[in-house]
C-alpha cells in the first residue's frame, strides 16, 4: 500500500462548485393521472405463446382531463371501461410512443376511479416482457415462463404507468396448469381449482413499487428454502436441480443477515426467492425483481460435476449484487433513468464489499481494481459520458447499463466511503434508507444524508464533479522533500485522456487520504 509521507488530509485542486442540474424529465406520460393499485389476472397459454389479461387499475385524476394515457406495447385491447362512467372510452394506441390512450366524452373530474381493461398479449422468445424458455430434460422437452421488465417492458404484460416514479401496489392472480408452480413477488395467498386441469393462484397485495420490479414465473419447478429472521429465503429451479442451488441458498442466508444489519432497515417482504432459469441472454445475467430475483442457471447453480472456485465466487457475487438491489433500487428507487447508477453502482459496490467481508480468503479486492481500471480506460475516451446522464427515451435508458454506470459508479462510492470513513458512510446510507423507503430519489438525496453525518467532510462538491462530468483526473506526485523537520509532497492535477491530447483539462476536487509511516 502506497502511503503519503504527510500528516493531514488534503483535497487536490480548488475548483468552482458544480451544481446538480435541474430536475430532469421524469415521465413521458401526461401528469394528469397517477396509478394507485393494479389488480391483475393472467391466463397464460404457453404452448401457443400467448396470454389473456385483465387488469383493474385504481387511479387518481389530479386535474380535469378527457383522456387517460398509459404505456402499452404488443397488447390487443378487447374492451375497457371506467367504473362509474356510462360511456365506454375510445381506445387508440401508438406503437412508436408505446402508449394507449382512453378518451372520454366528458371531462373527468379530479378524484379516484377504476379503469378496467381486458386484453391479450404475446409470450416472447426473447427475454423481454413475458417470455418462454425451452429446455430438455430426461423426460423430454419443457417450457417455462418468466418475466423481464427492466427497463421498460412491463408494458408488454400490463397496460401501466411503466416508469420508475409511478410506484403503486399490485395484486396478481394467475390461472395455470394444476401441476405447475407459479412464482411471484410474494408467497401465494390462495389456490383453488379452475376447471379443465387448471388452478387459480392468487397473490396478496404488494408494497408500493415500480412496475419494472414485478415478477411472474411458471413452470415445472422445485424450491428449497430456509428462514432468516422473518424472511423465508428460497432458490427455485427446474425439477431435479434444487440441490444445485444449495450453495446459493447458504450464500443468500449469510448475505441477507449482513444486509439487514448494514442498511439498518430489515428486508420488508416475507420471502426472497432467487429463480434459476435455463439458458442465457446476451443482454443480462440476473434481475432484481423485488422478492423474486431472476438469474440464469449458469450464474447461480453449482453442478458438482463441473463446479470450480470461479463458479462458486460468481454464484456468491451475483447473489450479493442482486440482493443489494432489494434496498438500493427496490425499496428506494431512482426517480428516472438519469440516476440509474444509484441502483447499479451501489449494487456493484455492495457486491464487492460483502463478498470480501464474508469470504476474505477469496481475495476479491482485485476484482474491484479490474473493474475500476476498465472503467477508467473507457472514461479516458472521447465517447465517454458522466455517471449521471440525461435520458429521454427508453432506448437511451437501455444504453445506460454500461461500465461507467456500474464500475465507475462503484469506484466513486469506494473513494467517497474511504474519504469520510466506513462508519460515517454507513450511517448516511442508513439515514437515506429510513427517510426514502418506498419512495423515489435523485442522487443529491443521498449526498445530503452523507453530508448530514460527515459534518467536517462534506462530499457533495466532490461527488458532483465525479458524477456530473466525464473523465478521469490525473494526479502527479513530485518527489518528497524534507526541510526543517517537515516532509512535503507537491501534487498537481490534469486529466487522463487517450484520444484528446489537446483537450483543455477538466478539474476535480480529489480527496487524498494522507498517513504517516512509523
Feature map (PLM): residue ranges:
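Solvent-exposed beta-hairpin/edge-strand motifs
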Residues: 65-89, 507-509, 513-517
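Hydrophobic alpha-helical and helix-loop surface patches within well-folded domains
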Residues: 203, 229-494, 500-501
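N-terminal, polar/Ser/Thr-rich
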Residues: 18-52, 139-144, 162-164, 460
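A surface-exposed beta-strand-loop module
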Residues: 74-137, 162, 195-196
